């Protein structure tokens, strides 16, 4: 395997799970998230030689993923899938664990946030370091901490509204 292939394989192994979760946060759909993750890594492969080391390579990959998701949403014009998802969940033969339900509800709540809030909270959930999140989102680390605090409060409010239903 040549150097580029080896480097790409390492990047994919290290970042694919986080990129999937980031994409899932945008789409709320596993198939679309997988497609967007694949598209992201195709772009990474195509542009790997052009990476200029001006930031961490993972930051560069996150930015590609975010731009890919935003392009997708612009083209697809986000569809309301809550009713379909609920129908599928109600009619699924397999029992769903309480943890899976909570994770599903969390992503449903995240999808209610504004775009920049979705990006930030998804990266926080994927345990990306704050300095890197600040760089990706283009804000100071201090401002990031305030935003995260506010996002958590909004998520709690949204989650509590769903829990009451």
Model-predicted regions and their roles:
Residues 120-121:
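A short pre-motif secondary-structure segment
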Residues 21, 35-42, 55-67:
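Structural recognition of an alpha-helix C-terminal capping motif at a helix-to-coil junction
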Residues 70, 137-161:
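DNA-recognition helix of helix-turn-helix
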Residues 2, 39-56, 75-76:
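Sigma70-family region 2
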Residues 7-10, 105-113:
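Short amphipathic alpha-helical boundary/capping segments
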Residues 78-103, 129-130:
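Internal acidic/polar
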Residues 1-21, 34:
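A short, charge-rich alpha-helical start-of-domain segment used by transcription regulators
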Residues 50-52, 63-82, 99, 150:
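Arg/Lys-rich amphipathic alpha helix in sigma70-family domain 2
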């Amino acid at each position: 395997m040549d150097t580029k292939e080896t480097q790409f394989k390492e990047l994919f192994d290290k970042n694919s799970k986080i990129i999937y979760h980031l994409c899932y946060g945008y789409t709320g759909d596993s198939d679309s998230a997988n497609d967007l993750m694949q598209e992201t890594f195709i772009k990474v492969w195509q542009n790997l030689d052009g990476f200029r080391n001006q930031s961490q390579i993972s930051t560069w990959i996150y930015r590609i993923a975010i731009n890919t998701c935003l392009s997708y949403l612009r083209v697809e014009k986000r569809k309301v899938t809550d009713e379909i998802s609920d129908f599928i969940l109600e009619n699924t033969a397999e029992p769903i664990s309480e943890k899976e339900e909570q994770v599903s509800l969390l992503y449903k709540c995240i999808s209610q946030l504004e775009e920049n809030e979705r990006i930030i909270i998804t990266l926080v959930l994927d345990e990306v370091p704050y300095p890197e999140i600040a760089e990706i989102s283009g804000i100071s680390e201090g401002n990031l901490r305030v935003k995260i605090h506010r996002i958590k409060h909004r998520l709690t409010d949204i989650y509590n509204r769903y829990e009451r239903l």
